[in-house]
Amino acid sequence: MDKSKRPFRKSKRSFRKRLPPIGSGDRIDYRNMSLISRFISEQGKILSRRVNRLTLKQQRLITTAIKQARILSSLPFLNNEKQLERTESIPRTTGTRIRNK
């Protein structure tokens, strides 16, 4: 076949397979904060399986470990650092409220 007759054929490119984010020696545990923190977004949400590139079993173990760490207050439920900075800068008035009748 002539090359002009098959313009939509994909070229075969070599690609490097990425290493898995969890090694065989890593223990998925609620106390392993360095491992758990890799799978949480900046907002404190658990990242999806596609983003993490984990297997289904690994993702389940990571989610339960994150939830256990949250319950034991090792991890916050939400990352509210920006909200705390805003509320600290706003001056609050401490006085009695006057009701309009």
Curated annotation (Swiss-Prot):
Keywords noted in UniProt: Chloroplast, Plastid, Ribonucleoprotein, Ribosomal protein, RNA-binding, rRNA-binding
GO CC, any one term: mitochondrial small ribosomal subunit
Keyword RNA-binding appears in the UniProt entry: yes
GO terms, molecular function: small ribosomal subunit rRNA binding; structural constituent of ribosome
Subcellular location: Plastid, Chloroplast
GO process terms (BP): translation
Pfam families per the UniProt record, alphabetical: Ribosomal_S18 (PF01084)
Gene3D superfamilies on file: Ribosomal protein S18 (4.10.640.10)
Keyword Chloroplast: yes
Domain of life: Eukaryota
Disulfide bridge partners, by residue number: none
Main localization, broad class: plastid
Residue ranges with Basic residues bias: 1-19
Region (Disordered): 1-23
PANTHER family in the record: 30S RIBOSOMAL PROTEIN S18, SMALL RIBOSOMAL SUBUNIT PROTEIN BS18M
Assembly and binders: Part of the 30S ribosomal subunit.
The family this protein is said to belong to: Belongs to the bacterial ribosomal protein bS18 family.
Official protein name in the record: Small ribosomal subunit protein bS18c
Organism: Chloranthus spicatus
Gene name in the database record: rps18
